[in-house]
Amino acid sequence: MTILASISSIGNIKSSSKSNIASSSSSSSSQSLNSIQCCSCSLALGNTVGNLVGGVLFGTGVIVGSVLNTVGNITTPILHPDCGCN
């Protein structure tokens, strides 16, 4: 009887730790989702302008798109500090 009770309590500890892990991973995934949503505008702008320029000069368009993406990644956390883009 004692062996069954100890096995039962070990099972409860394992299920408790699993629920803690699940709740912590879900909060981190929502944090990363938040950062993706916050950063998407600056990235989309850089890609769009880069693609427009790339229609005229392919090499220059790629460079301009990369520069604008970098600038967007730097300015977004400054302009929107509540976003997770840092």
Curated annotation (Swiss-Prot):
Residues 11-33 are annotated as: Disordered. Signal peptide: none annotated. Pfam families: Coiled (PF05710). Belongs to the hssA/B family. PANTHER family: HSSA/B-LIKE PROTEIN 17-RELATED, HSSA_B-LIKE PROTEIN 17-RELATED. This is HssA/B-like protein 60. The gene is hssl60.
